[in-house]
């Protein structure tokens, strides 16, 4: 997490738990840094790079193209062994066990005088069985001063999970990035704002230690412009389709990948869904419930966005939300969505079994049901 230094120097704040893990990187051939968007994993890699300067080469993966990524990797290694780079390029990105074996031997045979750390940022974009097998086979078997640091938003490979569990790979997960109440106090102090324990606990309760949310809370304390910052820095940069997905997730409260696939909520593949859910600043994953939801700090903003959106512009979103609630047997929530966009046929065509609608036939819901009856 960056600090607003009065001298203009780019300072990165790293909590003690994370610093202790980063200090172990030189002891491993392979390091996996795994955390969703907004936790500061790229900043952590930058912190390590700053401390090791000439020993680090960073590859920023910007697309799912494995060929472009592999050529960038070859070029990075070519700065130290041009012959190895030529051999690797002649093989190309590994497509089978034979390729993996050849590439593995070429990398293992590179000899360096000094340590070399290859940081691969956004590795999740090119993660695949072949390269994961290669990386896993190199873990603990290099002995040539080359280290790979894989920075990713999520792990979708059992191969990588198995390698992490074997102990041959240094794993730095989300739990090391989450701020404690003490971390929050220290971060505020370094940014010129002292807070007490009660205030720190309140911020932690709202943000759950999520780095980006804490940054927004700090900005809100300095000037009451949190929603404007969310809009200008985060929201306005999103595509219309992404905005619709986030509004839908806010309305339906939470969702699992399985539910999305079973209910056909999205046309995205499971891999595309994992990428979207784990690289959005707005979304968090509840490990206890195994469900994705909107982060608390963004809920008021999204509620206002939905309220301000014209009926016709959010018709598709509310229709999808209503359909999800119907499949969940939450008819009352579904009717609220359909009512807002005058979808009377969907309300009266739902025909719920009595035992499913009975729980919501309560006095506090009387006015809403009377509206449905009068306005149909």
What is each PLM-predicted segment?
Residues 8-22:
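N-terminal pre-P-loop "Q-motif" helix
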Residues 31-59:
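P-loop NTPase Walker A phosphate-binding motif
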Residues 35, 57-66, 92-93:
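A short hydrophobic beta-strand->loop->alpha-helix junction that borders the nucleotide-binding pocket
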Residues 38, 169-171, 181, 186-244, ...:
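Amphipathic alpha-helical "lid/sensor" segments that cap RecA-like P-loop NTPase cores
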Residues 43-45, 133-202, 212, 216, ...:
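Alpha-helical sensor/transducer elements of the RecA-like P-loop NTPase core
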Residues 67-90:
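Conserved NTP-binding/hydrolysis module of P-loop NTPases
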Residues 106-131:
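Conserved P-loop NTPase "ATPase switch" module shared by AAA+ and STAND
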Residues 252, 256-332, 343-344, 355-356:
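C-terminal leucine-rich, beta-strand-based interaction scaffolds used for sensing/assembly
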